[in-house]
Amino acid sequence: MKKTLILSAFLSIGLLSAQFKVNIEAADSFSKKTAIAYTLEGAKYIPLKEANKKNGKWIIDVPKNYMGMMRVYFPENGKTVNLISENKDVAIKLTTNGYVISKIDFLDESNQKMTHMMQIQRKKNQTLPALLEIKKLYNDNSVFDKALESEIQLLENNNVATDNHPFIKYYLDNNRFAAGQENSKISTEEYIQFFANSGSMLESSSLLRPALVDFLRRTSPETIDSEVDKLLEKVNLKTSRGQLILAELLSIFEIYELEKQKEKYFGLASNLNYEVNGQLKTIVKAIKNTSISAVLPDYSFTSNVTNTKAKKLSGVKADKKVVLFWSSTCSHCLRELPIISENYQKLKKKNIEVIAFALDSNSELYKEKTASLPWINDTELKGWQSSYTETYNVRATPTYFVLDKNDKIIEKPTNFSAFLSTLE
């Protein structure tokens, strides 16, 4: 009896302890506060665990078995570090200059090997094709020709041993499905089999969305619906993978402005008569809430808001509101700002207000860019981890919504000039 109790106690301790740890070392000038670890599901990073800094390090205990891509986010400065997990301890040392990361040293074997593999992959994708073309011009057995041949052989035969690295092996074996090569000979049927039969690491590999994009590129306007229907039937919408793939497809249709497909498969997702998973539920809700004629969900301004006394988006009184999601590092957005500035006073005379939410993480840059902007500005300083991305289905910047006085969406212009043209 005593042995049974002792064994049970040890099992309980094992279940409560970490599967592995992520250890990160960086100077206090980079960050003294919290670091948050994220795991990947499809194309969405999910917050997993956070840790406070102690003795110059963050030690994040990961409580579950996990193999795949990870991300660590530092809220104090908005920086992120990408890494992989093979359910083993990870060790990282950051060389920094203030908030800037100048070098990332991975001290664990898995991330060292993955970094090496990615370098080889880049050379194979970018350098090797150029070398092969040059080789055609110097096929003369000269010293230069022999050097070219040696480098080509090195790249073509430089394979990474992955026997003890299951995630790296999975990534290498299946990366071809997300290589973005439109002339690839992989058929849509092979893609469908890959999505349906691939191992459990597909969801955490970062390959799912680019592979879906490549799958869609192999269809035509005439075949896209039938191929997507085949895919969804094969992956089974009652499964978590099937629902995640449908959620990813809805995001892709929106990003690439495939409105016909978005409407068709949004209707399908909205009318499923069984329980749906979190991501599919979230995107269905977001699309519904940001469709023409929907009332845009309300938002409580942060302490960073300027040029208003209103506490919430709904508290801003105007005949029309132009809601803009942008970023200080987005070149397209920065080209829009002068156009808005030039027309802002004319809009105010028509009782039209502009409300801009920035997906920024750098406080100093945000303040510099917004200092002279007269309209309402706000930011959470969380970059793409901001709540806007999910609530308002923001997939790219700039994104615009035009609201009437009751906050009903009446337009979704692609740029500010398109909105101005409706006022003429």
What are these regions (language model features)?
Residues M1-I24, E424:
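Bacterial Sec-dependent N-terminal signal peptides
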Residues E222-V295:
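N-terminal targeting signals for export/organelle localization
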Residues K311-I340, E353-F357:
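Short active-site neighborhood of thiol/selenol oxidoreductases, capturing the structured segment around
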Residues R335-A371, W384-Y388:
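Structural microenvironment flanking redox-active thiols in thiol-disulfide oxidoreductases
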Residues Q19-Q193:
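A non-transmembrane, solvent-exposed segment enriched in polar/low-complexity residues
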Residues K146-I152, K185, R218-S226, Y256-E259:
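Helix-turn-helix repeat elements of alpha-solenoid scaffolds
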Residues Y274-S314, S421-E424:
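N-terminal "domain-start" segment that seeds a small globular fold
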Residues W384-E424:
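Thiol/disulfide oxidoreductase modules built on the thioredoxin-like
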